[in-house]
């Protein structure tokens, strides 16, 4: 009789983060159920046994069917307003249905399982900005949560549902709070709609790169493949991780002006043209306080618990992203 490998259910498998997690987990001897609204791209060199399932998880019964028999569930689904932004307004019920309601559905589905098997592990993609105004730049996860924006409030609400279910023995749940995740690798299958890749696109089009404020705001930027490795590694450490949130980051922050300048320089190497200008502009009306606070993430706790560390330096990640976009690969993504 063959070995029955664990079943990992990946929710949001065609998204920017989820597709990277799928590629990473596909290298493992596991069974994967890749769940998304549209069919997932199965890596050609996959070692895993992959089931592609299309579903609208907001439909009645869809979540229960998706997570049936799962040993581990990785929840990367997020509500994206329009085509490009995670920002949502107060009282956005459609966003709440996805960002909070799906977690509620997941927990109910697991709680209703027959039998007395071990509770499944659940890894949730949270956000470091859930903390709100911390009063300091370096965060390590011990700060009290006081989220300011609706997106962060909804993320925190979902996380609290998960951790309450962990305390009740329904799941073994952990929230991995992510900083700004960005970039492309040679096998990327989903668009990066964040600021870094947006600036790469602008530079390739010969447009100036608009910089809010004076450019001194620093960000801890995590390459998407490093973020994906964190979730794959988390599968092996559910017992150590469950019951709390964990911060992920590189431990190094970079001024956005320096990031934009480096993008302009790298694109110029491809185009043979002078680097595009980095220009200061007035922030848009939708900008909030978090857009002007520097963040550096101390992820020592997660590194110690899971043995993870980021492997791709910022400059190398930017270069991979520029190369992907300059080759026209991004334009072929759905």
PLM regions: where:
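Active-site Tyr-X1-5-Lys
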Residues: 148-174, 204
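N-terminal Rossmann NAD(P)H-binding glycine-rich loop of SDR-like oxidoreductase domains
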Residues: 8-28
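Substrate-binding strand-loop-helix patch
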Residues: 187-192, 215-228, 244-266, 312, ...
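Glycine/proline-rich active-site loop of Rossmann-fold NAD(P)-dependent oxidoreductases
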Residues: 156, 169, 181-197, 212, ...
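Conserved Rossmann-fold NAD(P)-dependent oxidoreductase catalytic core, especially the SDR/UDP-sugar
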Residues: 104-150
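Mid/C-terminal beta-alpha module of Rossmann-like enzyme folds, strongest
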Residues: 234-287
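Amphipathic terminal alpha-helices
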Residues: 7, 313-334
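NAD(P)H-binding glycine-rich loop region in Rossmannoid oxidoreductase-like domains
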Residues: 54-98
């Amino acid at each position: 009789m063959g070995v029955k490998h664990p079943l990992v259910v990946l929710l949001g498998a065609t998204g920017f983060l989820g597709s990277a997690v799928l590629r990473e987990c596909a290298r493992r001897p596991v069974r994967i159920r890749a769940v998304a609204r549209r069919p997932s791209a199965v890596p050609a060199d996959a070692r895993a046994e992959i089931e592609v399932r299309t579903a609208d998880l907001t439909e009645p019964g869809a979540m229960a069917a998706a997570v049936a028999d799962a040993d581990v569930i990785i929840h990367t689904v997020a509500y994206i307003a329009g085509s490009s932004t995670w920002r949502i307004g107060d009282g956005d019920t459609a966003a709440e249905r996805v960002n909070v309601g799906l977690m509620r559905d997941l927990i109910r589905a697991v709680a209703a399982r027959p039998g007395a098997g071990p509770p499944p592990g659940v890894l949730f993609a949270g956000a470091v900005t859930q903390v709100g105004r911390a009063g300091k730049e370096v965060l390590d996860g011990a700060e009290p949560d006081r989220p300011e924006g609706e997106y962060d409030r909804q993320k925190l609400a979902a996380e609290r549902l998960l951790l309450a279910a962990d305390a009740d023995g329904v799941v073994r749940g952990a929230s991995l709070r992510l900083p700004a995740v960005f970039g492309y690798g040679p096998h990327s299958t989903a668009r990066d709609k964040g600021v870094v890749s947006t600036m790469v696109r602008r530079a390739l089009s010969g447009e100036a790169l608009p910089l809010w404020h004076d450019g001194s705001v620093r960000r801890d930027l995590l390459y998407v493949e490093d973020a994906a490795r964190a979730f794959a590694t988390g599968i092996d450490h559910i017992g150590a991780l469950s019951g709390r949130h964990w911060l992920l980051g590189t431990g190094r922050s970079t001024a956005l002006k320096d990031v934009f300048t480096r993008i302009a320089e790298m694109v110029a190497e491809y185009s043979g043209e002078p680097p595009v200008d980095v220009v200061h502009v007035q922030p848009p009306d939708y900008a909030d306080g978090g857009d002007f606070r520097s963040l550096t993430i101390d992820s020592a706790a997660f590194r110690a618990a899971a043995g993870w560390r980021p492997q791709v330096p910022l400059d190398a990640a930017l270069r991979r992203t520029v190369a992907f976009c300059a080759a026209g690969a991004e334009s072929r993504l759905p």
